[in-house]
Amino acid sequence: MNTIKTLLLSSLSIFTIVTANAQSFKEPVAFKLKNGMNIIVSENDRSPKAYASFTLDAKDFEGKKDGIVELLNAVLNENVAKNSNLSFKDNSGKLAVATASLDEELSGMAALIQHASINQQNFNTAKAKLLTSLKAKDYDYDQSVNEESISALSLSDVKAFYAQVSPEKTYLTIAGDVELNNAKASAKKAFGNWSTYSHQESSILTK
């Protein structure tokens, strides 16, 4: 449970919804979907919105190339429509929406993660933007994310890493103005049909 709380609080700090009144948070509830995906739900009826964070389980990706997660996030961002409530940064996908829209928006997030378009154009654009940001030093990236590590990564590296991402290696945190049963249903609807096979097939199709 300590690991769950750490992950939850880390996610909440990204969304800047932690208030002075910590008592508004209920004890987080953790469970797994049938495909092995880890889900954490924390209700906070004082929050103005519903939030979701999609993260990778770091221990399942030991030995990965430096900067690969941040570059994959940058490529995924090229798949996100303008003015979207979804963004990929800080090694995670983040969603902030009105509670009534959570079900629909979470399904959209899942579809993008499972069937991202990873091609040369998106890769080149994402890599250029990330390198520009690193040169400008306009964001506090992890020390492994630097001009040298990003420059060394290829489209093949990103595709290979993306193909390794599967449900049992990921966490979905849902928090804020949500009701537990509704959050469970939304998570199952959005990610319940995700399988390693379908994800790898999608990666092959983007070649």
Give the positions of each predicted feature:
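Bacterial N-terminal signal peptides that target proteins for export
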Residues: 1-11
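Charge-rich, well-structured scaffold segments of protease-associated domains
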Residues: 2, 81-200
